[in-house]
C-alpha cells in the first residue's frame, strides 16, 4: 500500500513538473517544442543540417576526438 501511494505521488509530481517547466504553460504540452515543429516544415532552417565536421586531409583521432570527419572515416587523417 505504501509503495502504491509513493508511486502515485511520484507520477503526479512528474506530471505537474512537466506542465510547470513547459515553454508555454497556457497550452501545456501542445507547444512544448515549437521550434522543432517549424524546422520539420522547413528542413533548410534546421540547425542539424549544418554539420560540424572536419574536411578530408585534416588530422583526427585520439588527441582530437571532436569534431568528427565529414566522411566519417578517420585513420589518423580524415579520408
Curated annotation (Swiss-Prot):
Q: Which UniProt keywords apply?
A: Disulfide bond, Knottin, Neurotoxin, Secreted, Signal, Toxin
Per the UniProt record, one Pfam family is Conotoxin
Q: What Gene Ontology cellular-component terms does the record carry?
A: extracellular region
What Gene Ontology terms describe what this protein does at the molecular function level? ion channel inhibitor activity; toxin activity
Q: Which residues form a coiled coil?
A: none
Query: Where found, per UniProt?
Result: Secreted
Q: Does the keyword Secreted apply?
A: yes
**Which pairs of positions does the record mark as disulfide bonds?**
53-70, 60-74, 69-78
Tissue expr = Expressed by the venom duct.
Query: What InterPro entries does the annotation carry?
Result: Conotoxin (IPR004214)
Which region is the signal sequence? 1-22
Q: Which residues form the propeptide?
A: 23-51
Membership in a protein family: Belongs to the conotoxin O1 superfamily.
* Free-text comment on this protein's domains from its UniProt entry: The presence of a 'disulfide through disulfide knot' structurally defines this protein as a knottin.
The protein's name is: Conotoxin Leo-O1
| Organism, as annotated | Conus leopardus
